Amino acid sequence: MAQVKEQNPAPAQNRASDNSGEKRPRTRRPYYSRRPRRPQQPKEAAVPIHIYPLGGLGEVGKNMTVYECCGDMIIVDCGLVFPDSDMFGVDMVIPDFTFVVQNKDKIKGLLITHGHEDHIGSIPYLLQKFDLPIYGTRLTCGLIKNKLEEFGLAGKTKFVEIVPRQKIKLGCFTVEPIHVNHSIPDSVAFAIDSPAGTIIQTGDFKIDYTPLACGPTDLTTLSEYGQKGVLALLSDSTNAERPGFTATEQKVAAGVRSLFARAQNKRIIIATFASNIYRVQQIIDLAVEDGRKVAFSGRSMVNNTAMAQELGYMHIPEGTLISVDELNQYPPEQVVLVTTGSQGEPLSALSRMASCSHRQVRVGPGDFIIISAKPIPGNEKSVTKIVNGLLLLGAEVIYAGMYDVPVSGHACQEEQKLMLTLTKPKYFLPVHGEYKQLKKHALTAASLGIPTSNILIAENGSNVILSRDEIKLGEPVTAGAVMVDGLGVGDVGNVVLRDRKHLSEDGLVIIVATVDSKTGQVLAGPDLVSRGFVYVRENESLMDGAQSIVESALDRCVEEHVRDWNSVKTRVREALSSYIYRRTKRSPMILPILMEV
């Protein structure tokens, strides 16, 4: 049998020995057909994002946060805080804008979560530094425009109206507003997407399943971001110490309705935030049910309600609204007056009523007054002062703690847990609260399994650097409190406040003397003037002794040839201060005035 020659032998790995037991020769793959070994690619560096809180940490108010990534910056909120009781003469406190002014060319816009003063109150002062576009929901923009009108800035500012679920492109940032419940309509959280990842800043929020309007908080969108991956969550800590859930706004309507029933045959005066459109609408609806007319008092109340009606957020039946001047034309049981002053503001309408200085309204025994808001921390004394004043005038006053009229606009612990569970953040930064509230919120996050190494309690001025690999702190930036006193912004500092505190406690003694510019000899005086220290006519011996002490101090300066006037003033001040303290155990401010001739 003829043998067939194998012309194309199979590859060695697929061949076996033939029947003869001989192995076939191996064939080598040509060199050029070998696959080159791929060089190992270096791991791509994680893109960082910087978060600079300029306000709102360790305090309730003055909220302002700056984000920076890839050379672009955006700002979220720009609020104020009301002054503490020891900030004499200060009208408000705003953030220090030094850092944002230094980086103004990088800033792509200012995003606002909602229209409360602690989130929008400082905007006019920022716009006086430089122009930038403002992004906010319809009502929020309306409230800001009202504020800017007072500063002549409304026509110069660019507003961009935002809508929940519609994304905004700002440099390298893509921002999506997310609807949340709060005590004011049109409140949003922000999902801030950048090359570093997605950060969610909640703004002020609560989870109300039966809100008055606008629908519940958008838990679906928050959950979707949680499924995609959230780099960090910055969440409202105001009620971090309160267990359970925040009560629904529906509860307020029931509470106020019961108070209306108690106020039969009386005039009703209700104080609330001018920006709390929900609450004002509830009051209007109840007044209509009760057959009462409604009037507004307080500039911000009048302006905000007019704007809310114009934008369709408030509905007042025709014939219901009257002016404050018309109140006395109706019987007390037929009117409701909605006013500002729920926080004890000295110049508010309710404060002027309590001090009998309101031009149109006189409070008396026929009035039923409801303060429909809890005092912001630090305002308790001011509110108490107003309550006492109203009670002394004979009015019946309902305030926080007596009935469940105020309902918080902030999430309690269970709502905070739900926010953390839905968003599943890698890193967590509690914001918007005093340190004890931030700390408690951090503990809540840790109880849900977030590693403590991924939780950071920052401070105003911190430089928080986030990436997919780590969270760390960089060099801090300039941050602080700038005090506004009348038209002065930043010209009142700690030294001025210390002097004002000193004056308020112990008063002032002024020393006036005329001296020879060459010899230092006293030519006239010294004369002593007391303001807030003692009444001179009733303390003549004290003041005579003080005058002798000053004369002796000036004579010693002449004898010792002291010619430096600052040194002379210091000696006089020290001598008189020591004498007054020995006699009275008080330390008034002493101001020597030496006039050279």
Question: How should these model regions be labeled?
Answer:
Residues 561-597:
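C-terminal tails and terminal domains of large nucleic-acid-associated
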Residues 148, 445, 580:
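Conserved hydrophobic residues forming the short capping helix/wall of the S-adenosyl-L-methionine
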Residues 57, 81-91, 95, 106-107, ...:
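A glycine- and charged-residue-rich anion-binding loop/surface
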Residues 242-372, 376-545, 549-561, 569, ...:
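Hard-cation-handling environments
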Residues 28-111, 116-330, 348-362, 381-385:
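His/Asp/Glu-rich metal-coordinating catalytic cores
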Residues 133, 429, 591:
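Short glycine-rich phosphate-binding loop at a beta-alpha junction
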Residues 163, 459, 586-590:
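Short Gly/Ser/Thr- and Asp/Glu-enriched loop/turn motifs at secondary-structure junctions
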Residues 1-45:
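Intrinsically disordered, low-complexity RNA-associated tracts
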